[in-house]
Structure formats: structure tokens, C-alpha cells
Design a protein with these regions (language model features):
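Patatin-like phospholipase
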Residues: 1-44, 52-169
Length: 169
């Protein structure tokens, strides 16, 4: 008789890194295929996007979106703004994300999730582990100078990779 030992859950820290971050999708798929249970995810920037979509059950949709990106489609998401702390408003991307994540709240996910962002006024690291999933993700990837900062829970936040590129703490 073979005794099965209890499965150990792992915690994942998914880092930033722009386009390289899409590789997190493959990592999550490989862990699932090998039966490795993910107990929680912390993500920064694109790592927050991929991790949040995974826990929300939207990884297939995110992968389809990533695979469909062409230069023309990417340009279509650019919403240039004058003033406000970034070249891009980021609202077209944010709207697309909200369409797929609807009103999902972080605390309603079946496992803990934390998105890491940076408070622009202090430079401090901020862990977002409650509230709107799409807002938390948007704040975590709002690269200063490119995207406008995001108001979240009374704070003005930008990309978490500025203070914690891979949130292992």
C-alpha cells in the first residue's frame, strides 16, 4: 500500500519585468500540471496582473489577450494624456481589465493575493490585499512617467517594481 503524503502548499512571488512577465503564465500552468498547490500569490507589476488573473480564474483569457497583442493592437491601447504624471492615462487597459475581472474583490478570491505598489508621496512599499482586484493590479503596474498614478484606498500609487521587483517578503 502506498501512503500519500500531504501536499505542501507553496507561496509564489511573481515579479515585474514587462514582457518577460508573460512567462509567469507558463510557470503557473506547469505547477498546475505537476499538481503543485499554490497557497498564495504576491505580485508586482505584470506579476500582479498574471497572479491576480490566475486566482480569479481568468488565466486563459489573459493568455489569449497576450498572444493577440500585435504592435497595432498595443498602439490601440495607448491613451495619451497631457499632464497628470504619465504619458498614458492607462484607462483603456484598465477598462479592458475591469471588463474581464468585473467587480472581483481580492478578499473574495479562494486564496490570499497581494499586489505590491509604491506610494508616490513617500516612496514606501504598499501591500494591497483587499478591495478591487482590478484597481490593485492597475496600481501595481502604473509605471511612473508612462502611466498615470492610481488612487487606491486614499493613497496615490505607482508601480511596485520601484521598491520591490520580486515580492518575496
Amino acid at each position: 500500500m502506498l501512503l500519500k503524503t500531504p501536499q505542501t502548499k507553496i507561496a509564489l512571488a511573481l515579479g515585474g519585468g514587462a514582457a518577460r512577465g508573460w512567462s509567469h503564465i507558463g510557470v503557473l500552468r506547469a505547477l498546475d500540471e505537476d499538481g503543485i498547490e499554490i497557497g498564495m500569490i504576491a505580485g508586482t507589476s505584470i506579476g500582479a496582473l498574471v497572479g491576480g488573473c490566475y486566482l480569479a480564474g481568468k488565466l486563459d483569457e489573459l493568455e489569449d489577450f497576450a498572444r493577440s497583442l500585435t504592435m497595432r493592437r498595443m498602439v490601440g491601447f495607448l491613451d495619451f494624456v497631457i499632464g497628470g504624471g504619465g504619458l498614458l492615462g492607462g484607462m483603456r487597459l484598465s477598462k479592458r481589465m475591469r471588463e474581464h475581472l468585473s467587480d472581483i474583490q481580492i478578499e473574495d478570491l479562494d486564496r490570499p493575493f497581494t499586489a505590491v505598489a509604491t506610494e508616490i508621496s513617500t516612496g514606501h512599499e504598499v501591500w494591497i490585499h483587499s478591495g478591487s482586484l482590478s484597481t490593485a493590479i492597475h496600481a501595481s503596474y502604473a509605471l511612473p512617467g508612462i502611466f498615470q498614478p492610481v488612487d487606491c484606498n486614499g493613497r496615490t500609487l505607482v508601480d511596485g517594481a520601484l521598491v520591490n521587483p520580486v515580492p518575496v517578503s
